[in-house]
Swiss-Prot record:
Record InterPro entries: Clathrin_H-chain/VPS_repeat, CNH_dom, Vam6/VPS39/TRAP1, VPS39/TGF_beta_rcpt-assoc_1, VPS39/TGFA1_Znf, WD40_repeat_dom_sf
Keyword Metal-binding: no
Protein name: Vacuolar protein sorting-associated protein 39 homolog
Record localization: Cytoplasm; Lysosome membrane; Late endosome membrane; Late endosome
GO cellular component: cytoplasm; HOPS complex; late endosome membrane; lysosomal membrane; membrane
GO biological process terms on file: autophagosome maturation; autophagy; cellular response to starvation; endosomal vesicle fusion; intracellular protein transport; regulation of SNARE complex assembly; secretory granule-lysosome fusion; T-tubule organization
Length: 876
């Protein structure tokens, strides 16, 4: 306990006080004889009577409420509400209005709001709720009188006390409390709780923190949030709702008093209540809520809050002023008693300069946090450190085994560590968990600062993440890998910590994020052969190399080597897997690597690149064809030695297929290296790409003796070369006198003129071979009857072509005549275009000498409109 308030006696006189109201340093007394008296109370000038109205009413003044901003005093006397003007002292409570509709009122409550309009104008809205018998009747103040809100609530009993906050009106009956939500079209009733669990007690309600209800139940003060009773889109339909403060999860638990409350006022941050034998001052925070007991005011009947730090208390004929002790004095006492929360609340409402106030609050938070940490309340301590916005490094210093290295410029230690408790086992784990939560918040704050690219923030973030790493290793190591991927941990300190805990996989992540790829790959190579290691095998190395990308190509080649030697098939996936990083590797350099060190993988690599990735690079196609050709040559050589070579047929088929289907290789370059004594069929494909038809046909006829392939080739190229069948016949009718290539004998069927084959081709393709061109090459002794079929087909074809040409000429001549006649008809069409004519497109008139277009349907448009329409049609 400490002294929060001092008591000053104001008046001891013969008037019988029936009600009391106050604002600022003014207090208004309502007497049993109907008098109104206003006093001004000042610490320096003392007590001064400002207004006095001896004959305001013939009946007692039972209740008063002041609206200081509007200089209005609402008075309840003779069961009716009246309004006075307290603006001018000389007026002595000038009467303004008496509300006849309030006749029968036993008590009332008010709601004052100052909404801001869209234009920025602030107006005061005053609403009054009167208890008239068993009804609540609502009014509003406008144009100096009370007007009906046309809202009436029927009650089950006569209310004893009322309190209005926003959309809710709380009613205290002799045995229970009820809240009415008046935000909807119809009032909604919500039952709260009984006034007492055992006997009937007078209800007591007070407004807490301007938006909460403080309600007395037995010896408790229950804080209720009225917003939970507001109907929102028909969701809250319950009529019996448990108060927030009665819920075990509420932050404001019921406040115990020495005896049931008789009266209560709220003076931030204290609840000041009148109990049986004294006035008690209590705080809503902390374990020990009792702040002060004022036994000398045990005879009081009334309490009223006037202003911040000022309360008036009254007995039947006495008046006291209760003033708050200066906050710095209270704060000093509270800090000595280690009541840090209350010290913070008091400092928040002090009149000290904002900067000084913020600094003081920060210091109290740090003291409170240190006290909580010493008491092993780690989670609460970290929350206080967070509120103090302390340097996270100073919090980390509370854990000596977590401090990575001294931080430059921190000789002035904010949080002393000498008195911190030694932590072991469960306490240490709880402390680590609390520290993790705190550092997670601190990390978010530092990341925001990093956007300003401040190096100090980067350094602090590094310390935070390194500390988090150590905490995770002690509490939940599954969080280590995600933390390392954020790439803010200190390399050397984290490396040492991970090695100490044998976290090899996490160490790889650290190296990877820090760009220490060589160290990571060395470690992977070492662990690959260790039995039982989490990194045993090749897969992790393969995946790591795949993710490096083209910027680290030398490193990929260096560490892919051992994988390729160990398992070529798996190792090849380093360069062929379906990953963006893999596909983007420079393929020419990868090819050079395979050619120089792993030649057996050149063909599989190029096949994947060309077949799967559809690479059309000429170099790659040329190299693959060269590899195919060289391998086929080696297999042929082995076959000549009598060895079995099952690979020969499929490999030669691959070579033939690629030469036939690929359009991306360079045929002239391939031809330079291609052998002339073997693979002549493949050579023919290359020559065909070079359009050397005579050479191709010579190979098919004179070397291979394959008339079918020669004929098929001629048919395939007939459209581009109409004389190709003439070339084919010449190959058959004029055999060469010597071999086409050294060491390659001529085919025996075509070393001499083969008349049968020649006649068969002539008869089959007669329409494609001109007799005038071929006759000079026919043997002189060839009988004419053998050529009869060929000549008949050929001549018929020529006659049909001539007849078709004649018919076409006739058709064209007739069409020309028709078009000339149609043109003449169009030229003979006349139309009138004058100043009244308008364009059918833009609806504007035609100006003199303007260009226009006339459509066949008779519509006439400007030339520019026609062009615009034509462009629009073209775009569609």
């Amino acid at each position: 306990m400490h002294q929060a308030y001092s008591v000053h006696s104001i008046l001891k006189q013969g008037v019988q006080i029936e009600s009391i109201a106050a604002y600022g340093n003014h207090v208004i007394l309502g007497t049993r004889s109907g008098q109104l008296i206003m006093y001004s109370v000042d610490e320096e000038t003392g007590v001064d009577m400002r207004m006095f109205n001896k004959n305001f009413s013939r009946k007692p003044i039972t209740q008063m409420e002041v609206i200081a901003s509007e200089n209005l005093l609402f008075v309840l006397t003779d069961l009716q509400v009246q309004v006075c003007d307290i603006r001018r002292i000389e007026s002595n409570f000038a009467f303004m209005h008496s509300a006849p509709d309030t006749k029968g009122c036993t008590l009332f409550t008010m709601d004052v709001d100052t909404p801001k309009s869209t234009t920025g104008r602030v107006a005061t809205v005053i609403r009054v709720c009167c208890a008239i018998r068993r009804r609540l009747v609502f009014f509003f103040w406008k144009e100096d009188k009370l007007n009906s809100l046309e809202l009436i609530i029927e009650l089950s009993d006569v209310p004893r006390t009322l309190c209005w906050v926003g959309h809710a009106v709380c009613v205290g009956f002799k045995d229970e409390y009820v809240v009415y939500d008046i935000s909807g079209k119809a009032p909604k009733k919500h039952n709260l709780f009984l006034t007492s669990s055992s006997i009937s007690r007078d209800p007591c309600i007070c407004l807490i923190r301007n938006n909460m209800l403080g309600i007395s139940k037995d010896s408790y003060l229950v804080v209720v949030d009225p917003s939970q009773y507001k109907e929102s889109d028909g969701i809250n339909n319950s009529t019996d709702v448990r108060p927030a403060a009665m819920d075990s999860n509420s932050s404001l638990t019921p406040l115990l008093w020495s005896s049931p409350l008789l009266d209560l006022v709220w003076d931030e941050p204290f609840a000041v209540g009148r109990v049986n034998n004294a006035i008690e001052v209590r705080s809503l925070v902390g374990k020990d809520t009792l702040v002060q007991t004022i036994p000398e005011l045990q005879k009081t009947k009334f309490l009223v809050h006037a202003d911040k730090g000022t309360i008036f208390a009254a007995a039947t004929s006495e008046l006291w002023c209760i003033r708050m002790v200066e906050i710095p004095i209270q704060r000093q006492q509270l800090l000595q008693q280690k009541k840090f929360q209350l010290a913070i609340e008091l400092t928040q409402i002090s009149d000290e300069p904002a900067a000084d106030r913020a600094q003081t609050i920060r210091q109290i938070h740090m003291l409170y946090a240190k006290e909580l940490f010493t008491n092993k309340e780690f989670s609460a301590a970290m929350k206080e450190f967070e509120k103090a916005a302390i340097d996270p490094y100073d919090v980390i210093r509370l854990f000596p085994n977590l401090v990575p290295e001294p931080k430059p410029g921190t000789e002035d230690v904010t949080v002393p560590t000498s008195s911190t408790p030694a932590l072991e086992d469960s306490d240490l784990e709880n402390a680590y968990l609390a520290l993790i939560e705190y550092l997670a918040w601190a990390r978010q704050r530092e990341v925001v600062k990093l956007r300003d690219t401040k190096s100090s923030s980067k350094s602090l973030l590094e310390i935070i993440d390194t500390t988090l790493l150590k905490c995770y290793l002690q509490t939940n190591d599954s969080l280590v890998a995600p933390l390392l991927r954020l790439n803010q941990c200190h390399l050397e300190e984290s490396e040492k910590t991970l090695k100490k805990h044998n976290k090899i996989s996490e160490l790889i992540i650290l190296y990877q994020m820090k760009g220490k790829h060589k160290e990571a790959l060395k470690l992977l190579r070492e662990q690959a052969s260790i039995e039982g290691s989490v990194l045993q095998g090749r897969k992790r190395t393969i995946r790591y190399l795949q993710e490096l990308g083209g910027d680290h190509l030398p490193l990929i080649f260096e560490f892919a080597d051992w994988v390729l030697n160990d398992n070529p098939e798996e190792g090849l996936t380093i360069f062929t897997d379906e990953l963006i990083e893999v596909e983007s590797l420079p393929r020419a350099k990868v090819l050079d690597f395979f050619i120089s060190k792993h030649k057996a993988l050149v063909i599989p690599y190029l096949e994947h690149v060309i077949t799967e990735w559809k690479d059309g690079n000429t170099l790659l196609h040329n190299v693959l064809l060269k590899q195919y050709r060289e391998k086929v040559q080696r297999l042929l050589a082995q076959q000549e030695k009598g060895e079995e070579v099952p690979e020969l047929i499929p490999m030669r088929a691959k070579l033939y297929k690629m030469l036939e289907e690929s359009n991306d290789y360079s045929p002239d370059r391939l031809l330079e290296e291609f052998p002339t004594n073997i693979l002549l069929e493949e050579r023919a494909l290359i020559l065909g790409r070079l359009k050397k038809h005579d050479n191709v046909l010579s190979i098919y006829i004179h070397v291979l003796g394959d008339v079918a392939k020669a004929t098929a080739y001629a048919e395939a190229h007939y459209k581009e070369d109409k004389h190709i069948f003439h070339t084919l016949i010449k190959c058959i009718l004029i055999p060469p006198t010597q071999p086409l290539y050294d060491g390659v004998p001529l085919h025996p069927d075509f070393s001499q003129v083969n008349r049968e084959v020649a006649l068969e081709i002539l008869n089959t393709h007669a329409t494609r071979i001109d007799p005038f061109e071929i006759f000079e090459h026919l043997p002189d002794d060839m009988p004419m009857p053998q050529l009869e079929k060929y000549l008949e087909k050929s001549i018929r074809k020529m006659m049909a072509d001539k007849h078709e040409m004649q018919m076409m000429c006739g058709f064209l001549e007739a069409e020309s005549t028709r078009l000339e006649n149609a043109l003449e008809e169009q030229r003979n069409i006349s139309f009138e275009l004058n100043e009244s004519s308008v364009c059918s497109e833009c609806k504007k008139r035609f100006q003199t000498q303007s260009a226009f277009v006339r459509y066949p349907n008779g519509h006439i448009v400007h030339l520019s409109c026609h062009d615009r329409l034509a462009r629009a049609a073209a775009q569609q």
